[in-house]
């Protein structure tokens, strides 16, 4: 969500090096968390970044269930990025510990600085039923989805708008259904390395099922420890439909160039 602010920070740090070296640091993090929305930007080609954290949902009065949403990202080209989502659940009310449904996606930025769409990208993804329905860690369905992403900078405030559609595979003999998601996410610098994010998001029912629509508000600070490391924490408060309130905390860390790490590993083995 604060990718724009971080790119600006990287440019400021690079300014004394001269005009020819004002390109953003390839290790500058591109945080997609903590918001539900993602942005249109991508990790630098050949670089590896991981996002992880803990989220506690208030399942019952006095009880919370905890999960660790984790996303691994690899920059493929200047405009494409491979995502691997591997959620992990801790034992709690209505769920056992274990790995949830794994998903793979490819973010492809199609436009830069468009007059209407801003930085525009598409993110097709597939979710596999690797979790357990019985243990409460998975849906038991194979899902296909695509997210349209429009990112803007409005006088230093970053705005990310997402619209997603998912075709939910039928479980056993049941028919497939459809799911949608909308998000409007905002981020702005507060002071120094401290920024703040705020987001509205919702899941309207479109398939005629009895599943109620939901909507919620997310907000909290983020702190850029270094160009390659960003921290976040905050709250999620529902205002429509049946969904739990939640607290979260997490980290985004760019681990650097995959090729460079491979070369270092080879050198260490040959010594």
Model-found features: residue ranges?
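N-terminal secretory signal peptides that target proteins for export/translocation
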Residues: 1-4
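Bacterial N-terminal signal peptides
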Residues: 7-16
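Transmembrane beta-barrel domains of Gram-negative outer membranes and organellar outer membranes
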Residues: 20-271
């Amino acid at each position: 969500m604060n990718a724009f602010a971080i790119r600006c920070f990287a440019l400021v740090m690079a300014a004394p090096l001269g005009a020819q070296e004002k390109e953003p640091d390839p290790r500058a993090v591109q945080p997609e968390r903590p918001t539900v929305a993602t942005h249109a930007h991508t990790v630098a080609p050949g670089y590896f970044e991981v996002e992880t954290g803990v989220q506690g949902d208030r399942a019952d009065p006095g009880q919370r269930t905890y999960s660790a949403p984790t996303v691994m990202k690899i920059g493929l080209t200047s405009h494409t990025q491979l995502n691997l989502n591997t959620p992990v659940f801790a034992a709690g009310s209505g769920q056992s510990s274990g790995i949830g449904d794994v998903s793979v996606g490819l973010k492809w930025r199609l436009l830069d600085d468009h007059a209407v769409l801003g930085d525009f990208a598409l993110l097709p993804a597939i979710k596999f039923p690797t979790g357990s329905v019985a243990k409460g860690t998975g849906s038991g369905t194979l899902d296909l989805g695509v997210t349209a992403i429009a990112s803007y900078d409005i006088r230093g405030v970053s705005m990310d708008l997402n619209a997603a559609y998912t075709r939910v595979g039928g479980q056993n003999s049941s028919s497939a259904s459809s799911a949608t998601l909308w998000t409007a996410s905002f981020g702005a610098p507060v002071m120094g390395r401290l920024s703040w994010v705020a987001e509205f998001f919702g899941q309207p029912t479109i398939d005629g099922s009895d599943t109620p629509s939901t909507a919620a508000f997310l907000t909290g600070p983020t702190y850029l420890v270094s160009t390659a490391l960003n921290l976040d924490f905050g709250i999620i408060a529902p205002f429509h439909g049946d969904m739990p309130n939640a607290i979260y905390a997490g980290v985004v860390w760019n681990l650097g160039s995959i090729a460079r790490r491979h070369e270092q590993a080879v050198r260490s083995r040959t010594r």
